[in-house]
């Protein structure tokens, strides 16, 4: 835990988590949580993920959950109630809004804004300076769970540098937004 970091009440920081300098972690946040798997999960890897890393001068909001295996750049805001799943990389100066969910295996660029209650599905990539408005939903499975081979076909969403997605939009699997 870096110099100048302030940790709120009832915060859980799991073993090995790396937290930079001058980070603020608000009440009830959970840092470095290992993922859990349902019996029918498509993700079969049960090995322990490496510790999460949070860069300098980040702010982690109340009740935010950041999983192990995440790398969060410097000067990011992960707002209240946001979730950042395992194997996610977030660039510098990015905002993950209140209640937003970033699923596993995503790459989020620098200086992005992902607003309140947005859902970024697994295997998505958002390049630098992307704006995602509130309540945007993305998807990665065209078969809606019906195709037994769907796991081979899953593809998240790609948003190119500077891309913008408006409020309450639904983006289908494999789409690229310029």
Enumerate the language-model features and the residues they cover.
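Structural signal for interior beta-strand "rungs" in well-ordered beta-sheet cores
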Residues: 1-38, 42-178
């Amino acid at each position: 835990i870096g110099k100048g970091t302030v940790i709120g009440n009832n915060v859980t920081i799991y073993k090995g988590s790396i937290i930079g300098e001058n980070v603020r972690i608000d009440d009830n946040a959970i840092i470095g949580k290992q993922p859990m798997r349902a019996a029918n999960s498509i993700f079969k890897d049960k090995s322990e993920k490496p510790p999460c890393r949070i860069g300098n001068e980040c702010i982690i909001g109340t009740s935010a959950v950041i999983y192990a295996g995440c790398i969060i750049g410097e000067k990011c805001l992960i707002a209240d109630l946001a979730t950042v799943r395992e194997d996610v990389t977030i660039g510098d100066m990015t905002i993950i809004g209140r209640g937003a969910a970033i699923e596993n295996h995503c790459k989020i660029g620098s200086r992005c804004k992902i607003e309140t209650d947005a859902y970024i599905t697994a295997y998505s990539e958002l390049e630098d300076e992307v704006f995602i408005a509130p309540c945007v939903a993305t998807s990665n499975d065209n078969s809606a769970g019906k195709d037994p081979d769907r796991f081979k076909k899953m593809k998240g969403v790609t948003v190119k540098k500077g891309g913008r997605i408006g409020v309450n939009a639904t983006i289908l699997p494999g789409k690229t937004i310029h």
